[in-house]
């Protein structure tokens, strides 16, 4: 990696909202060790991501990568859909 080349952050999560045009909300869960008790606790973050073709649906597992700010809350882009949700 050169001096002006950055590594791109990517996260995998589940789509919890696709109601906006060209945007999705992705829930990313991680496990963190509690500093005092040592138990692993689930922590989650909701990321607003750009979905250019409106191809994601609620329940899909997707991979997103960090990008420049696209709006007030949106600074992630959809990379690919890992797994489609089952149709009910």
UniProtKB/Swiss-Prot annotation:
Quaternary state and interactors: Part of the 30S ribosomal subunit.
GO molecular function: rRNA binding; structural constituent of ribosome
HAMAP family: Ribosomal_uS17_B
GO BP field: translation
UniProt name for this protein: Small ribosomal subunit protein uS17
PROSITE patterns to which the protein is assigned, alphabetical: RIBOSOMAL_S17 (PS00056)
PANTHER family given in the database record: 40S RIBOSOMAL PROTEIN S11 FAMILY MEMBER, SMALL RIBOSOMAL SUBUNIT PROTEIN US17M
Keyword Methyltransferase in annotation: no
SUPFAM superfamilies in UniProt: Nucleic acid-binding proteins (SSF50249)
Pfam families: Ribosomal_S17 (PF00366)
InterPro entries per UniProt: NA-bd_OB-fold (IPR012340), Ribosomal_uS17 (IPR000266), Ribosomal_uS17_bact/chlr (IPR019984), Ribosomal_uS17_CS (IPR019979)
Function (record text): One of the primary rRNA binding proteins, it binds specifically to the 5'-end of 16S ribosomal RNA.
Keyword Ribonucleoprotein: yes
One of the record's GO cellular component terms: cytosolic small ribosomal subunit
Family: Belongs to the universal ribosomal protein uS17 family.
Record key words, sorted: Ribonucleoprotein, Ribosomal protein, RNA-binding, rRNA-binding
